[in-house]
Amino acid sequence: EREIHAFQSEASYKVTAIFLVPDTDGKLVEMKAELARRLKTKAEAQKLLEHCQAAMFTIEDITTRPVKKSPAAPFTTSTLQQEAARKLGFTVAQTMMVAQRLYESGRITYMRTDSVNLSEYAINGSKEAIANMMGDKYVHPRHFSTKTKGAQEAHEAIRPTYMEQAQIEGSAQEKKLYDLIWKRTIASQMADAELEKTTATISISNASDTFNATGEVVKFDGFLRVYRESYDDDVEQEDESRLLPPLKKGQKLQYQNITATERFTQHPPRYTEASLVRKLEELGIGRPSTYAPTISTVQQREYVEKGDKTGEERLYNVITLKEDKIADDTRTEITGAEKAKLLPTDTGTVVTDFLMQYFPSIMDYNFTASVEKQFDEIAEGDTKWTTIMKTFYKTFHPSVESTLAAKNAHKTGERLLGDDPVSGKPVSVKIGRF
């Protein structure tokens, strides 16, 4: 939240052009292209559009290359929580509750795991199910490796118990989550999707800049026939799925309009439950069994609340070239609007500040990860638990004692608001235990 408030947005101009190109029937169709770079100032954008008024546009180069997309690994606890939030709108706690019911009824394997490995039984079952439903060309058995920091891999990845069972009986939530798990698991054992990506470079006769038009066509759908991975709403996905009309090198193009739109850099996105789980996993904080309880606890104690940000109005500039005339327009947009994000409360801010001041070592992101590593050493018999506890309390206990001794000088959870204008005495607010 502090990074967001401290963020300074920077403006630039994104230039897009719509060209009219004949299709296979000779009918003119629209083709979108984007300038290869962002322009830093309005004056620079204005100057480019002035050049375009009298310019000739020519296809300078066409490149076509094959592209392969591979499926994601089967679900771990973390990735299941993230994908269920994005695709189904489930909270982290809701996902674990439904997964628990599926596990207890024998529908899926254990749902608290950081492993992406599948047993040979599951791989063979997937292979058979894919071949029966879609044919042998869709089969591609795979073994995945876990890349998460501190992963223990005590269990298999989350998968259906019987791969041939595509649907189950149960509640609507159970059916949805099972369907998600089944598709993800099946897709992980399917062939790559094969695509062809085409990029056309368009030159401007009186300027050094170029426009790029890109298109993508699926040659073989592979795993995409079953499953497409979702992304957080704050991750911008390029729209390259459109097809390009027939083009040839040296072809002259006619523009319909060219637009320079003022755009702004965005502040770091606030966390959703799903993106917070991903961050916890990246930092090595906690285990699959603790992600959901951690996120629930900080909300129950009102350190964090889930809510929406309405956003603010912002003016932005649009310069348009159409029919050889340049128009300059100022428009309004809403920026910063966010839905279902985790927002820190005043209580959470005060508690965090207090802990950062008096217990910085425990608040360090590496603390939990290092403790988890020490637990692993205890489990493997390399270290005695008493040694680790003594080392920890040797520094922790004095910190607690010194903090208690100082609490009369600075009350726990206390924030100074200022001086009373009548009495001149300091006014403060104190927050209770939680």
Could you describe each region identified by the protein language model?
Residues 1-44, 87:
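C-terminal helical "lid" subdomain and adjoining coupling/linker elements of P-loop NTPases
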Residues 3-6, 12, 45, 63, ...:
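Basic, low-complexity terminal or inter-domain segments flanking catalytic cores
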Residues 98:
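Residues within the DNA-recognition helix of helix-turn-helix
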